[in-house]
Amino acid sequence: MITNFVIGICVFHVVLDEAQINYFVVNKKFRKKGFGTYLMSYLIKKCEKLNLRKLLLEVSQSNVTAERFYSRFDFSTVGIRKNYYKDGSHALLKEKKLTTK
């Protein structure tokens, strides 16, 4: 039995009617088991309950796995930050429009 073990975490902040995901990660041992999907679905529902219009994030263009994950939740690429990361890779700016009540 594992106690007090973090499987995944999402750090985000709200500005006006938008939320920005700053950090979203699932422990490698627990990937492909639905935890990331659960966490993202939970975040989206919470943001919609807060009547937020958009959910935003940045992801490295070279992180194909993360890009595929975000596309499953209908995040679209709305911009690019060239040479954003230390290795020179670009950051893709992603946005998901939310359903407000």
PLM feature spans:
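Short hydrophobic clusters on alpha-helical segments that form packing/core surfaces
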Residues: L43-C47, L55, A66
